[in-house]
Amino acid sequence: QDRLVDQVQQTLRRRGYAGLDVDFEFLPGQLAAAYAAFLARLRRLLNSQGFFLWAALAPKTSARQAGLLYEGHDYAAVGAAVDGVLLMTYEWGYTAGPPMAVSPLPNVRTVLDYAVTEIPPEKIFLGLSNYGYDWPLPFVQGVTRAPSISNQRAIELAIEHDVAIQYDETAQAPFFHYTAADGTIHEVWFEDAR
């Protein structure tokens, strides 16, 4: 830890950064307290030099949420240890998962509803997706892989294939289907200004 802290401080000063956002993922639950203690130590050191410390948190919906992505992030402890948190409210639709919105609004709201019970609201910021995925169909779990695409590329694909962009009112996300030159049907979810 000491070497990491020293290197972080040197990098912040050398590059002229204002602070640091720590994004440690897949921490086992038994390390949750140690992780929060590390963040508290790092914050004290960084704040004393005029830097801020933030931490990115997996999108939890309860304190006891199971899973390696969630168990190492104690929202209350991390929220107390840092200057601010960035909730990773994206990746419900992802490369290896079934076609769906990257950041469905009901999921984002559920995470935020829980977060404000554990972390002061003024410390909470939402991570927003600015990309999409292009799934070849049919989706087969463990086999299908959807490449990520920019929102602009998604719009270009819809134009190239002369298909209408639809809008899922529940997820609050645009999507469309198109048929590739090889006959494969694709489903694309992305984000736009709506």
Give the ranges of each region predicted by the language model:
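Gly/Pro-rich active-site loop or hairpin
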Residues: 94-115, 172, 177-192
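Surface-exposed substrate-engagement region within the catalytic domains
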Residues: 73-79, 88, 118, 149-164
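Short amphipathic alpha-helical segments and helix-helix/interface helices
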Residues: 39, 43, 75-76, 112-116, ...
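Active-site glycine- and acidic-residue-rich loops that bind
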Residues: 61-69, 105-108, 134-136, 146-149
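Chitinase-like catalytic core of GlcNAc-active glycosidases
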Residues: 1-104
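Active-site region of glycoside hydrolase catalytic domains
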Residues: 44, 48, 84-87, 93, ...
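Glycan-binding loop/region signatures in secreted carbohydrate-active enzymes
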Residues: 130-194
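Long, low-complexity, intrinsically disordered polar/charged segments
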Residues: 5-32, 120-125, 144, 148-149, ...
